[in-house]
Amino acid sequence: MAKDVKPTRKNLMAIEDRIDLSERGHDTLEQKRDGLIMEFMDILDQAQDVRSDVSENYETAQRKIDMARAMEGDVAVRGAAAALKEHPEITTQSKNIMGVVVPQIESSKVKKSLDERGYGLLGSSARIDEAADAYEELLEKVILAAEVETAMKKMLTEIETTKRRVNALEFTLLPRLYENQEYIEQKLEEQEREEIFRLKKIKAKKEEEEKAEAAAEAAAVEDPEPAD
């Protein structure tokens, strides 16, 4: 509460410094929040596109694998899958978006040639190749979706954190500082008025005393004591 603050000029200067710092911090955080929201909206648009792509690629891959099973049989499809020589490699790096560290997923060996798939020309068919192509494309989209979704969650968390800090400054700290500032200013003004009034009383009393002394001196001059 404001009454807990000692009304001194030193405290007033300290509070004014805190207000200045808090206002600048509030403005900076507001700019950061607005920038984060803009970045988040861009990522959200990208996430929606990626989700749509994943859904479409999944349906295509399912259709292709169902066709391969129907035409070539489960044994041939499983044999082609078991012949895979190299699995995809995924590495994770990071990038900074307005102070938020988000993942950047790099993948390799997702799209493969017939040799890399392991079953070769003789062990393959057009249906199995199409299914393999479809699932490789689906995997690429899933990897991208993981990157975008993680970035979106991290950005959203940072936005909420920044919002809370902005609100704490705007609705809690700054109002309390303004209240303390106003309280001290009022008390200092009261003290100043009281001091002026006290000095005026002292001055008036001194003037009265000086007048009395002057009157006494004048009376003594006009009515000197008789000589012996």
From Swiss-Prot:
What GO terms in the biological process aspect are recorded for it? proton motive force-driven plasma membrane ATP synthesis
Keywords, comma-separated and alphabetical: ATP synthesis, Cell membrane, Hydrogen ion transport, Ion transport, Membrane, Transport
For membrane topology, the record states: Peripheral membrane protein
TM regions (residue ranges)? none
**Gene Ontology terms: cellular component:** plasma membrane
Q: Which InterPro entries match?
A: V_ATPase_D
Q: Among its keywords, does the record have Metal-binding?
A: no
- Where does this protein reside within or beyond the cell? Cell membrane
Q: Where is this region: Disordered?
A: 205-228
| Transport is among the record's keywords | yes
Q: Name one Pfam family in it.
A: ATP-synt_D
This protein's assembly is summarised as: Has multiple subunits with at least A(3), B(3), C, D, E, F, H, I and proteolipid K(x).
Q: What job does this protein perform? A: Component of the A-type ATP synthase that produces ATP from ADP in the presence of a proton gradient across the membrane.
The name of this protein is A-type ATP synthase subunit D
Source organism (scientific name): Halorubrum lacusprofundi (strain ATCC 49239 / DSM 5036 / JCM 8891 / ACAM 34)
Q: Its gene?
A: atpD
